[in-house]
């Protein structure tokens, strides 16, 4: 006979070493069952940990295997040490048993006749897994359920211990068990009976183990155990030793019953639970030695758990039973040797086989195999050409759109960089591509980046952040919500294959963020850093298959357990012409347009942008987490076409083998695949090879079911590194929409090289094909992706598992819906989006799921709102009201940090039947708590509280009402704490002070119930009920005294607030007093209480109650307590005297005075949120009237509302106050009935951060070029370093310290210069626009600045004080040069440079214009203008409103330039930037889009500046104002006072120019300021101040603008001033406008003109602090107005790198020296200012 013994101790001392050896052996080929056991137990423990309270769950480390926890987690010292000992001891013994039976092949057969099982403690529980398993193969599943039972048993013991003697999670562990030797059981029991007589029953010490030698183990709360051994007597002197038993009380029949067992075995799977035993081996009870009675596995588990919880271990009984059963040869099997085993060996005279010996066996490793792990896609997002989200992507597919286009201006100049012949160096032969609109749009503030850093960061990195966030949001990701979302186990893997932005954009002017902003590794790294993911982070480059390869790596990472969640995708944004050139010259690209996939005329692919992100999890984890599963990746693989004719050529046999490999891994027949999403580039070689491989595998002959093929590249082009993820997202959308969209790649005819697809039943959808789920056949999609580098990647996608639709509602009847954002604008937009969604989907939206999604499955931000309702219509109504509140006048404020919470425990007050009925019936955590407390009541000998709660007892006794009130308060306290609402301070009134003391940790739940119950019994015995009562009065104490006759005595029992007093007295007196008060207009309410608490009515019980209170264990406060008795604050670590409760029973409750004292001590502040915990809010008004301006006061229960309604309102208020509610914990009981909704994505606050690629330097690289023929030529400046289209040669160059003089000459007839003039014609002649001068002056000024200060980058410059004297008109005869001379000189280049322009003839030099260039600060300008931007915007809006009213005109682009041509000037297309204009008199606004330009060759392109500025000329020359004559007069440029652009003008960007011209001081002259607004940035970025136009008779136009070649231009004009100004400018302006006048558009409120830059010099006007702020604003790109004392520097992009830069700048520019960590040590603007002051 076999005796199988399972011990209650580990077989070795070093637990970690044991589990390491088990792990090593599990890798052996012999131990497949062991591996399965570990996997099953891991899943079971994961599920149980998911159900733990957050405060415990978050203390556990992430783990992939249960062995990780057993080995690496120091569980022996954790608060749940006992719980984990249950788990790991059972696990160890089961692993040892299974491993032995695998390593030593033997019969797994245990019958009643040949085997018997027994065990001690937790080993007894482990034995049930073997007894309940018919075969060895059945053990893993059974063991997993037993492990869950063990964990739950440990938790039951832990919670019971907390009820008896609560311990904080960080407190040192204390032993609950002591071994006592020599005395024997009877003697110990006598001593315990004597000692326990003064101890409440649940807290009494008891015997848990009786050893055969007479030693006993005694158990009990550690503090009571210490008291026991400090009491003189035999136990004090007996030999004893505390044991490492920390979990709580076990083997305690007085503490546990069958209800605990039912919860422990609740989740046993039915297929295991109902296994029947017929001839199974018996399991002997460790209590009486008798076999457990069980017919099924469930009954066996229940019996074993009951014995474990309630039975005293008597090992002698087991030995005696075994001795009686001895029959023949006996062999003992056990895990290691121990004292019980040795006793077995002696009694049975039997040998022992050690089940640990196999751990030393040599390991035969398992051959590498593919891990059978299905991967779920749970979130996705994209930015694609023509589609900035998933919805638009599907619309694009459904509509069959082909979105290819010419390369847009924001990438590069397609005309100069394209040459279809390929003869020009480095040009592309195709102008086509597919592009994302505005790829620079980004919410920098959300991701804690400064505008400066955002601009320097590759847009693929930024869009990766945006799409990763959106995919995570769709997945319902909350950091650390579940084991699979623990941040330490999340990986990021992205495919990338180019560096366009780094090479063509950011590289033009390298800044501090060049490296982290552009190198590929930083894209996934930045995502990991922002979200604080600590898992692997990879950037993958396999060329065109990079993103699908990244997904494959992600799947492998998940399968191997290296991560629990992966964010993966692909990135591609095209900005460099080099790749276009290289690919087109290698014949990859189509010269005729998009990808013509499957077309007979396919001539190559069309390049495309693309950014896509996916969130991946193991399928089991996704289902456990209640995620939405979009699709399931069954298998993925990659191979390489090494047998191809060249590295870039596809190879059909290799692709074919790849498909077969993937299908083998997935276990799916190729004939079951319905759709192949092909790579499909539209190249002849690629399409033919791919169709060959696809048909050979999926349709080698005609198949019965249709096979559809398609390729997304026909719609979107080839996204290269993003191609694979784009195709995968398309496949997922197909599952989502149950339709296969039409293929649009065939433009002429099907590729003639294809086989007969119809014969093979292979179809290319010409229209959208419905494809709905089928009940008996799953849908599969093969996604194929190959690479120009030879790689092939494919994956098989299965449709998502079907889930039942949730019912109409879960148990809750009212729900909270939340909306939040990082800024007010996004909050408003998020709110609008949610409302639009609800209106659109109102009938099908499940209210519970909506609440669950917006609360438990959303990351929450400081700007937030919460509404509650009982229906979707309710929610919409409340959202509409909140949206109305979010006006500009009342923006929603942000709460920076969670508020302190104060718990207020009210007294007995208004008891009513059915208290907390809804929670008790439908919220299991609360019900479980109430039942535990009810069990404590019964164990103390008090009546049950359940009848009073379930409405079955209408008139409960005073004892029951008091017990019920306190138990409900304790349960509600635990409920709030489970939701992460924990108190910073506690106050209790009257009876509520008992629950308050429990909340502070001063009383255990058991002691609290004991004291309340004993007090209630004393009242029943010693106080006559209903002879006295209490009266609540709304008056002051003095007012009450003034209304009560002297003959009527009363006592003031409670001072709740200044005007809320409760008095006590005899019932007759109180009745009379009530009548007296009411007759004088005071409100008085008699309380429904049988006794007059806090009065002399309590005197009879005080002495006895004080004696009883000594029996409770006094503990130090863990939370500050506000004492209404002492009118004081008792801080942590204070221990209350035992007499406190008796004194509180009799003493006056001075609630308001105590609150005021706490307020004065700042323990309560204006930010404190009060949570009243009681059966009805009786003290909320007292709190409000005592502490003014508090954040919120919320109730927990109300007698006039159902529980859901009250809690919803309170949780909404707490949420808006920024309390950190654990919504996941709240919804956990309901989660199976709820679904994660696909709600609208976050509304970003997008601004365009984009460095425009300028010029054509990518074409000529290190070679000079002649734009006409591409040949090299030498610059006319003879290598002196400056050559632009308008500056040709240096004729004089002199420099000295700080200054210099340079003279340059330019040939007006040179082709580029002449082209500038030709775009601006007057009277049919080219005329050099005066806005050519800014480019010439600023280019030369920058050159001079660089020469004088070669180590300093040129700053922003203001070209002002400009006076135009004559026009510059090219000669008709261009056979000889026509020279214009520019002179610039300065004595201090850092301040001002004088500029003059001259026409140079053979015998004369004529002055054309003069001006100055002043050095400025762009950031200061932006700050300056931000203060007036709203005024400009208001005028623009007023003009636009006039259009709608029909009182102003909106002119189209064609109309504007038609009027210009008829009035004064004919502009070429390059100058025609105005897209539309609104004009009203002398006021106008124009929308301007600048033409493309090679920006690296210009400083201020004339056609850009002219486009921005000529709205002022249009107003005067072509406008409709009545106060000037534009019929007989034309207006030409006289000059301007200042021209400043804080940011470069960008081709393709939308600007808005606003001007109002007014008469100037000189008669006929008009002046105005042109404000330039960047529409995308919504800010003023440029200003032409004091622009002045002078009148010229129209009749003289031909004289001045069509002269002979030797004539002057308007030099003899009668309107010309007689005296020319000198070169040195004056500080004032000669063309300041007069006072503003009225307008039909409303009063004009334009700010005063900005002063001259020399007057507003930043250095001379600002203090050091304001200089410092300006520097911070400049370096981060933040507006000065956005910097306030609360601004967090890290959130505007001041990281460690920028911190060092600012420290250096402070030292250089301010003379202030700080350490490198200064901005990290002082992280807000306010702190920086204080340090500087």
UniProtKB/Swiss-Prot annotation:
Annotated segments matching region N-terminal hotdog fold: 1288-1420
Positions of the Carrier domain: 1659-1733
Cofactor (UniProt): pantetheine 4'-phosphate
MF (Gene Ontology): fatty acid synthase activity
Region described as Malonyl-CoA:ACP transacylase (MAT) domain: 903-1211
Catalytic activity, EC: 2.3.1.-
Comment block on domains: Multidomain protein; including a starter unit:ACP transacylase (SAT) that selects the starter unit; a ketosynthase (KS) that catalyzes repeated decarboxylative condensation to elongate the polyketide backbone; a malonyl-CoA:ACP transacylase (MAT) that selects and transfers the extender unit malonyl-CoA; a product template (PT) domain that controls the immediate cyclization regioselectivity of the reactive polyketide backbone; and an acyl-carrier protein (ACP) that serves as the tether of the growing and completed polyketide via its phosphopantetheinyl arm.
Identification of the protein by name: Desertorin synthase
Species assigned in the record: Aspergillus desertorum (Emericella desertorum)
